[in-house]
Amino acid sequence: INGGVDEKSHEQCGPNYAPITSEYLNYDEVLPKYVQMLDWLAGLYVNVLNLIQYMHDKYYYEEAEMALIDTDVRRTFATGIAGFSHVIDSLSAIKYAKVKVVRDETGLATGYEVEGDFPKYGNDDDRADEIGVWLLRTFLEMIKKRHTYRNSEATTSILTITSNVVYGKYTGALPDGRAAFTPFAPGANPSYGAEQNGLLASLNSVAKLPYHWALDGISNTQTINPEALGHSEEERKENLVQVMDGYFDQGAHHLNVNVFGKEKLLDAMEHPEKEEYANFTIRVSGYAVKFIDLTREQQMDVISVSYTHLRAHE
């Protein structure tokens, strides 16, 4: 939108092409420019990773690990996606609503005002979810068409661990309404506050992403209030198993599930010295971690993830 210029530093960080100067964003104008920028970024990404892999080899990183392997090795080239849901919702907002650009005194876009409603990823709405499928396929194709070190097989992931917090710190406002320099939603999770139709609709959206296009992982983290799963312990276990079975039956592969109340997290954050929290472990996008070992900013990000309540009709 800004023609490759960073709105915070005012530096030319990407390819120098004509910025969008209109008051409202037009989907047919934004999409080709986004694809152009994404293709440039994919090329830069692969080039940097090629250098990293070469340096690993130079200092015997891989040789030491694989010295005893006497078979042909299938080499993969891992890449990853962050801010996935925000791109989907941003393109959806531009396509289905009206997005007004807020500019600074130099004319650079620094914020956006969304007028009207638009379909959001995470609600089992094909209008938004199909943008996600297109985005994943397009990015992987851009990676695959480039030379990779040792002719390795290009793969990708939608899995951020806790880096979504760091990446968000350096990313300005987006057309989906996300404020500047705030955390991205983790992994393949819908954007914060986007889920309006309950847990099952959210899972259905993520399950539509073809796993064979993201063999390094499509991470989805859900924190569920125990009461949302039923009244008794047995009922909760049974309902959770059914939810997970339904998700994986659709071809999904990775689900991080936390079942506890928000109050427990808040108390652990304020009173980490309590004995009960010494080994209190939660699932974060891709791995398990002791909650009290996270930074306060990371803890707040975990707490910000929407607590899901199963709707009556589900």
Region spans (language model):
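Structured mid-domain segments that build the active-site/substrate or prosthetic-cofactor binding neighborhood
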Residues: 1-116, 199-305
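Catalytic nucleotidyl-transfer cores of nucleotide-processing enzymes
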Residues: 1-17, 150-209, 220-222
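Internal maturation/activation junctions in enzymes
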Residues: 53, 64-66, 101-187
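Unusually extended, aromatic-enriched hydrophobic runs near protein termini
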Residues: 135, 139, 143, 193-202, ...
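Conserved small/polar residues in nucleotide/adenosyl-binding loops
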Residues: 308-314
